[in-house]
UniProtKB/Swiss-Prot annotation:
NCBIfam families: PRK00124.1
Family per similarity comment: Belongs to the UPF0178 family.
HAMAP family: UPF0178
Name used for this protein in its record: UPF0178 protein BH16190
InterPro entries found in the cross-reference section: UPF0178
UniProt source species: Bartonella henselae (strain ATCC 49882 / DSM 28221 / CCUG 30454 / Houston 1) (Rochalimaea henselae)
Length: 148
């Protein structure tokens, strides 16, 4: 698993799934951050250059990689690279959905830039945490059934 560590609210849940299934997990960010002392967990600190964490993640995506990110452009890159991508709210991004999600994200950014939309995403809640855990468990189970 690869985690885009910037503002990831489900790290604790990821670590539990990592231990349950014995999955090597990389937590990637452009600055130092604390991590639990776990053999399966590896901290990756990249340069502070724009998108360097995203670039590292995409370079290390494999067919059976699960990437957790709330960054829609990164999710699109992961899907194109053949990885499985989940948001912290449990949304699965795949080839059939990522184009629409990316277009909607770009539209909302444009509207916000023009001052036409002032809303922001709703706060992260317990329901999101539960949906994420279910989606992550399902993704791991699917990959295991496929022989990974």
């Amino acid at each position: 698993m690869l985690i885009d560590a910037d503002s990831c609210p489900v790290k604790t849940e990821i670590y539990r799934v990592m231990n349950r299934y014995q999955l090597k997990t990389f937590v990637v960010a452009n600055r130092f951050f604390p991590l639990p002392d776990e053999a399966l967990l590896e901290r990756v600190v990249v340069s502070d250059k724009f998108d360097s964490a995203d670039d590292w993640i995409v370079e290390h995506v494999q067919e059976a990689s699960i990437v957790i990110t709330s960054d829609i452009p990164l999710a699109a890159r992961v899907v194109r690279a053949g990885g499985v991508c989940l948001s912290p709210t449990g949304r699965t991004f795949d080839a059939s959905s990522i184009g629409h999600v990316l277009a909607l994200r770009n539209l909302m950014n444009d509207l916000r830039g023009q001052g036409k939309v002032i809303s922001s995403p709703r706060p992260f809640c317990c329901k999101d945490r539960s949906a994420f855990l279910s989606a992550l468990d399902l993704a791991v189970q699917r990959l295991k059934r496929c022989g990974y």
